[in-house]
């Protein structure tokens, strides 16, 4: 039985891929990339032959990028939180070299949110 890591898509990255990837071949490659990212064995061995998953250098929060297709340049940005994978963005082929600019343009997706403070009996009178 294959063990998988769940993928969370709070930002609609899967929907964006379906809408914006220009060919059926890239849509299939996107699904194959998600399959590899879910594969616990790839995480255990830290080998991602299809997506070449790697950490983005130069941003304060840990952000990772994975290839949808190396030739076309389409990339998936993701982060780990509590051992879970959270999809953050789908990067268009022509823009994949501008990685930090792409992250900064949507920085609210990448910044860790501080836990909400409890309202238990601490109200001002």
Could you say what each language-model-derived stretch is?
Residues 1-74, 80-125:
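Basic, Lys/Arg-enriched alpha-helical interface segments
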């Amino acid at each position: 039985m294959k063990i998988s890591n769940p993928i969370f898509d709070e930002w609609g990255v899967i929907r964006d891929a379906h809408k914006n990837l220009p060919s059926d071949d890239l849509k299939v490659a996107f699904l194959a990339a998600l399959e590899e990212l879910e594969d616990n064995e790839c995480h255990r061995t830290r080998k991602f032959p299809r997506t070449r998953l790697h950490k983005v250098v130069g941003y304060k929060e840990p952000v990772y990028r994975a290839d949808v297709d190396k030739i076309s340049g389409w990339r998936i940005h993701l982060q780990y939180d509590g051992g879970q994978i959270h999809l953050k963005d789908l990067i268009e082929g022509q823009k994949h070299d501008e990685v930090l600019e792409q992250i900064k343009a949507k920085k609210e997706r990448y910044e860790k949110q501080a836990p909400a403070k409890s309202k238990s009996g601490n109200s001002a009178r």
